[in-house]
């Protein structure tokens, strides 16, 4: 007798059964060096070379970071973990409330078809205004972070200075 017996009724036409996927959506595992409060160096984008404070890991596998804006002009923003270098410098983020920041907070507003057409007709009139809510949130986070930053001497100057490599610098030998 075989391990699996043939079915009693068999269809005249063979129907291909779809393959079962064995992939599952799992949360990203971050590097051990990426802990909230770590000072990171941004490697790409508008703020490349800036030192920022890591606040939180978001659901879309991005990192929530801030300059603070008052120190080096980097606002609250999402960054891919691939484009940062973690330094050994840490800042306490216990007093910073980051519960309200999630993927929806950073989502772009969807435009209707009519609004899209108007935006395409007059591209020079497009100026993106910053929501007052975002500005207020930035001020609250900055205030809490600056209180912690001031406790460490020269940390404010360190965060305001940008990172770059000079001729002869060997990045694989640098200790961040």
Swiss-Prot record:
Cell compartment(s), UniProt: Cytoplasm
Q: Kindly give the InterPro entries that the UniProt entry links to this protein.
A: 60S_ribosomal_eL6 (IPR000915), Rib_uL2_dom2 (IPR014722), Ribosomal_eL6_CS (IPR049633), Ribosomal_eL6_KOW (IPR041997), Translation_prot_SH3-like_sf (IPR008991)
Instruction: Give the position of the cross-link Glycyl lysine isopeptide (Lys-Gly) (interchain with G-Cter in ubiquitin).
Output: 128
Lineage: superkingdom: Eukaryota
Q: Which PANTHER family match?
A: 60S RIBOSOMAL PROTEIN L6 (PTHR10715), LARGE RIBOSOMAL SUBUNIT PROTEIN EL6 (PTHR10715:SF0)
What the protein does comes down to: Component of the ribosome, a large ribonucleoprotein complex responsible for the synthesis of proteins in the cell. The small ribosomal subunit (SSU) binds messenger RNAs (mRNAs) and translates the encoded message by selecting cognate aminoacyl-transfer RNA (tRNA) molecules. The large subunit (LSU) contains the ribosomal catalytic site termed the peptidyl transferase center (PTC), which catalyzes the formation of peptide bonds, thereby polymerizing the amino acids delivered by tRNAs into a polypeptide chain.
What are the GO MF terms of this UniProt record? Answer: RNA binding; structural constituent of ribosome
* PROSITE patterns named in the record: RIBOSOMAL_L6E
> For the modification Phosphoserine, which residues carry it?
12
Q: What is this protein called?
A: Large ribosomal subunit protein eL6B
Q: Which GO terms describe its cellular component?
A: cytosol; cytosolic large ribosomal subunit
Which Pfam families has this protein been placed in?
A: Ribosomal_L6e
Miscellaneous notes: Present with 38400 molecules/cell in log phase SD medium.
Self-association and partners: Component of the large ribosomal subunit (LSU). Mature yeast ribosomes consist of a small (40S) and a large (60S) subunit. The 40S small subunit contains 1 molecule of ribosomal RNA (18S rRNA) and 33 different proteins (encoded by 57 genes). The large 60S subunit contains 3 rRNA molecules (25S, 5.8S and 5S rRNA) and 46 different proteins (encoded by 81 genes).
Q: Which Gene3D superfamilies match?
A: 2.30.30.30
Return the similarity comment.
Answer: Belongs to the eukaryotic ribosomal protein eL6 family.
UniProt-listed GO biological process terms: cytoplasmic translation; ribosomal large subunit assembly
**Where in this protein does the record put region Disordered?**
1-22
Keywords carried by this UniProt record: Cytoplasm, Isopeptide bond, Phosphoprotein, Ribonucleoprotein, Ribosomal protein, Ubl conjugation
From what organism does this protein derive? Saccharomyces cerevisiae (strain ATCC 204508 / S288c)
Location (main, coarse): cytoplasm
């Amino acid at each position: 007798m075989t391990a699996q017996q043939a079915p009693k009724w068999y269809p005249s036409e063979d129907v291909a059964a779809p393959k079962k996927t064995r992939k599952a959506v799992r949360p990203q595992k971050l590097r051990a060096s990426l802990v909230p409060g770590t000072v990171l160096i941004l490697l790409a984008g508008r703020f490349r070379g800036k030192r920022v404070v890591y606040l939180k890991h978001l659901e879309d596998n991005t990192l929530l970071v801030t300059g603070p804006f008052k120190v080096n002009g980097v606002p609250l923003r999402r960054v891919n973990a691939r484009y940062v270098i973690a330094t050994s410098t840490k800042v306490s983020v216990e007093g910073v409330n980051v519960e309200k920041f999630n993927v929806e907070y950073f989502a772009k507003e969807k435009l209707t078809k009519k609004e899209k057409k108007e935006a395409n007709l007059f591209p020079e009139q497009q100026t993106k205004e910053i929501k007052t809510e975002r500005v207020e949130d930035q001020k609250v986070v900055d205030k809490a972070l600056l209180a912690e930053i001031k406790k460490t001497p020269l940390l404010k100057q360190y965060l305001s200075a940008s990172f770059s490599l000079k001729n002869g610098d060997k990045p694989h030998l640098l200790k961040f």
